[in-house]
Amino acid sequence: MNDKTTSLHANVDQHEIDKFESVASRWWDLEGEFKPLHRINPLRLNYIQERADGLFGKKVLDVGCGGGILSESMARVGAEVTGLDMGKEPLEVARLHSLETGIPVTYIQDTVENHAAEYPQRYDVVTCMEMLEHVPDPSSIVRSCAKLVKPGGHVFFSTINRNKKAWFMLVVGAEYILNMVPKGTHDANKFIRPSELLSWVDETNLRSKNMIGLHYNPITDKFRLAPNVDVNYMVHTQATDNSDL
């Protein structure tokens, strides 16, 4: 496992970093603050594998990897994974967990913009899950992900729609009624409409291939994928020729 740390603080919301650093030690607690991420991870992984025609042997970058839940799961199925994040504590947790499990993942503390400048067209697959709504300029993240992927490669985004339903479900419901995540986890003003995300995608060499919603049923306590993108949603894009970037 190789590590690299670079000090660069552009397009970083320190409040968001601090928020996740404060609970980083419990990242791999299946019943803790990150329980929803553990619950949805099989759905995310299956979607990525199916849309990218498998991950075995592919170079994958997980942008905003946090404590490494998705990163490790992709490495477990044979991908060569690099996890990128600006949170020092979550990365330390990710590195320790990788050592414990023996699943190799390279973790780097850096911004995606800087990583894109250093490693253009390096990866077969780039994932950016539950991260866009936590940065000052999400469109910059989209552009950088586009630069990092090889021509023909796949980029996956997931975020939260900005509307009253999403606010009620994720802020009122998940934070205050069901206590699924810590209070203050979400800032509804930073939620991103699908039309906004797709407009940023269209400004790059990426082309949207699929969009799917992620749904939680509080009665059955189950997550599932479905066409409705009113709340949580994922977008699969594929790169064309990067020469114009």
UniProtKB/Swiss-Prot annotation:
Assigned keywords, A-Z: Methyltransferase, S-adenosyl-L-methionine, Transferase, Ubiquinone biosynthesis
Binding positions for S-adenosyl-L-methionine per the UniProt entry: 44, 64, 85, 129
Catalytic activity: a 3-demethylubiquinol + S-adenosyl-L-methionine = a ubiquinol + S-adenosyl-L-homocysteine + H(+); a 3-(all-trans-polyprenyl)benzene-1,2-diol + S-adenosyl-L-methionine = a 2-methoxy-6-(all-trans-polyprenyl)phenol + S-adenosyl-L-homocysteine + H(+)
Top-rank taxon: Bacteria
The protein's Enzyme Commission number: 2.1.1.222, 2.1.1.64
CDD domains: AdoMet_MTases
UniProt key word Nucleus: no
Gene Ontology molecular function: 2-polyprenyl-6-hydroxyphenol methylase activity; 3-demethylubiquinol 3-O-methyltransferase activity; polyprenyldihydroxybenzoate methyltransferase activity
Any one GO BP annotation for this protein: methylation
Presence of keyword Protein transport: no
Pathway: Cofactor biosynthesis; ubiquinone biosynthesis
Role description: O-methyltransferase that catalyzes the 2 O-methylation steps in the ubiquinone biosynthetic pathway.
HAMAP family: UbiG (MF_00472)
Family, as annotated: Belongs to the methyltransferase superfamily. UbiG/COQ3 family.
PANTHER family xrefs: METHYLTRANSFERASE (PTHR43464), UBIQUINONE BIOSYNTHESIS O-METHYLTRANSFERASE, MITOCHONDRIAL (PTHR43464:SF19)
Protein name, as recorded: Ubiquinone biosynthesis O-methyltransferase
